[in-house]
Amino acid sequence: MLMPVHFLLLLLLLLGGPRTGLPHKFYKAKPIFSCLNTALSEAEKGQWEDASLLSKRSFHYLRSRDASSGEEEEGKEKKTFPISGARGGARGTRYRYVSQAQPRGKPRQDTAKSPHRTKFTLSLDVPTNIMNLLFNIAKAKNLRAQAAANAHLMAQIGRKK
């Protein structure tokens, strides 16, 4: 039962891995993709038998594979807004996905057309934490240096006696 999953992972690793000097030839990959589809279907059949293991580990991907739940989740994540093209009319209308987190009144700007750059701000906690870590490292180095100096002095005292 677990063999198709390992087989699927091996095929995905071989297909998705970087290749040196060889272009991806997808026109010859039909048998490989059919093997992937059969392995995936066998894995989905086997996952129903192992439902107790899946509920313990909280793998939600395989349990929500029916089409209706996938469409509902996709509908919650993204919305489409029509964008009129340069030609106008129905021929020039394109659709762009806008995530739910963006404001509803303003569709987002294209990043290529945006004149100003995105600014990132850090909270003051991040530099404070970094400085605390650097101070702790410096203290530890100082303590190690003092311990080494003390050990050296103790060795000299021991030689003199």
UniProtKB/Swiss-Prot annotation:
Top-rank taxon: Eukaryota
Annotated Pfam families: CRF
Main subcellular location: secreted
Ranges for region Disordered: 64-118
Key words, A-Z: Amidation, Hormone, Secreted, Signal
Modified residues (Isoleucine amide): 157
GO cellular component assignments: axon terminus; extracellular region; extracellular space; varicosity
Residues that make up the propeptide removed upon maturation: 22-118
GO-annotated molecular function: corticotropin-releasing hormone receptor 2 binding; corticotropin-releasing hormone receptor binding; hormone activity
Intracellular or extracellular location(s): Secreted
Family per record: Belongs to the sauvagine/corticotropin-releasing factor/urotensin I family.
Subunit structure: Binds with high affinity to CRF receptors 2-alpha and 2-beta.
Function of the molecule: Suppresses food intake, delays gastric emptying and decreases heat-induced edema. Might represent an endogenous ligand for maintaining homeostasis after stress.
Protein name: Urocortin-3
The encoding gene: UCN3
